[in-house]
Amino acid sequence: MDQENSEEPIEFQISDELDLHTFRPSELGDLMPDYIGLCLQKNIFRIRIIHGKGIGTLRETVHGLLRKDSRVLRFKLADQAEGGWGATIAWLTHASSI
């Protein structure tokens, strides 16, 4: 089997931080809900999403997806110590039925 063409999923550790620097806005529609679901499975209820400062396209996409997700209680731009307007902090619901 050719290792370079392997379609095996890549496993990675879920943490309270998601760095989106390598993603395009069009890739976030599946990524963000999946990430939130995995965080809830790990009992992570406060997350930091790093979208960068740039022109704001990633930030706007992230905020739009957070607004639509019923598992998100609230969110805000991070304070300076956590990335300022280059990151967003979100609080997730503790309810397991959602």
Task: Identify the residue ranges that each predicted region occupies.
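Long, charged, low-complexity intrinsically disordered regions
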Residues: 1-98
